[in-house]
Amino acid sequence: MVQTKRQKAIDLAVVPGKSYGIDEAIKILKTATKAKFIESVDVAIRLGVDVKKSDQQVRGSTLLPAGTGKAVRVAVFVPSGAKAEDALAAGADAVGMDDLAEKMQAGDLNYDVVIATPDAMRVVGKLGTLLGPRGLMPNPKVGTVSQNPGEAVKNAKSGQVRYRADKAGIIHCVIGKVSFDDEALKLNLQALLVDLIKIKPTASKGTYLQKVSLSSTMGPGVMIDQSTLSLK
C-alpha cells in the first residue's frame, strides 16, 4: 500500500522502543488520526503479575473523570420496587427480573453493561452462557453487582470502564476519543492508573506498571514515559 507523505511523517515520529511524555504522545495520536470516524483512544498496560496465580489476577473498574465519549446501554436485574425505580430514574435502558431474562434468551442482548442486585443473581445465574462470553456477567469486583443499582447505572452512564488483565497480564481499556481535550485524556489515563495501583496484588513483586502505551483506533502505539504522569 502506498503511504502518503503525512503517514510517513507519522510513522517516523514514533520511534520503536522510545517513551514519550504524555503531552507529546497525545499530540502524536491526534496527528495520526486518519479514519473518517472519530477514533477511540485505547490504552494497553502491561502489569508485573502472573495471572496464572489466583492471587495475582487483576480486575476492577474506574469512573473516568471525563467519561468515555460513548453512549452506554444498561440493563438492570432488580425486583420491582424502589430500587427498580431508582435504576430507571438513573437512565437504565431496561429493568426487570424473569421477564428481562426471557428477552435476553430470545436474543435481546444489545447492552454494554448488565447490572444486578445481589437478590437478582438467582435469575442472572441462568444466563451465564449468554452473558459470560460477552463480558456482561455482573460481578461485584467491577461494581455491577450492587445494592444500589441507581448509583451503579449512573456510574456506567457517566463513563465507568471495567477491565481485567488478560493471559499476558495486559489491561486493555478505552479512555476516550481523539476529539477529547488533551487534558481530559490525560486525566482519564491517570485516574485509571491510580485505581490499578490501588488494587495491586500483594503477591506481585518488582515493577507493577511495566509498560503503558496509547493508540488511536487506526493509529500507531505510543509508549508513555510514566514520569510525566501524576499518579498520586
Swiss-Prot record:
Instruction: Please tell me whether the keyword rRNA-binding is annotated for this protein.
Output: yes
Asked whether the UniProt record includes RNA-binding among its keywords, one would answer yes
Task: Cite a GO CC annotation.
Answer: cytosolic large ribosomal subunit
Q: Which UniProt keywords apply?
A: Repressor, Ribonucleoprotein, Ribosomal protein, RNA-binding, rRNA-binding, Translation regulation, tRNA-binding
InterPro entries xrefs: Ribosom_uL1_bac-type (IPR005878), Ribosomal_uL1 (IPR002143), Ribosomal_uL1-like (IPR023674), Ribosomal_uL1/biogenesis (IPR028364), Ribosomal_uL1_3-a/b-sand (IPR016095), Ribosomal_uL1_CS (IPR023673)
Q: Which Pfam families does the entry mention?
A: Ribosomal_L1 (PF00687)
Q: MF terms per GO, please?
A: rRNA binding; structural constituent of ribosome; tRNA binding
GO terms classed as biological process: regulation of translation; translation
Function field:
Binds directly to 23S rRNA. The L1 stalk is quite mobile in the ribosome, and is involved in E site tRNA release. Protein L1 is also a translational repressor protein, it controls the translation of the L11 operon by binding to its mRNA.
Q: Which HAMAP family match?
A: Ribosomal_uL1_B
Q: Which PANTHER family match?
A: 54S RIBOSOMAL PROTEIN L1, MITOCHONDRIAL, LARGE RIBOSOMAL SUBUNIT PROTEIN UL1M
- Give the family, as the similarity comment puts it: Belongs to the universal ribosomal protein uL1 family.
- What is the annotated quaternary arrangement, including any partners? Part of the 50S ribosomal subunit.
State the protein's name: Large ribosomal subunit protein uL1
Its taxonomic placement starts with: Bacteria, Pseudomonadati, Pseudomonadota, Gammaproteobacteria, Lysobacterales
Gene designation per UniProt: rplA
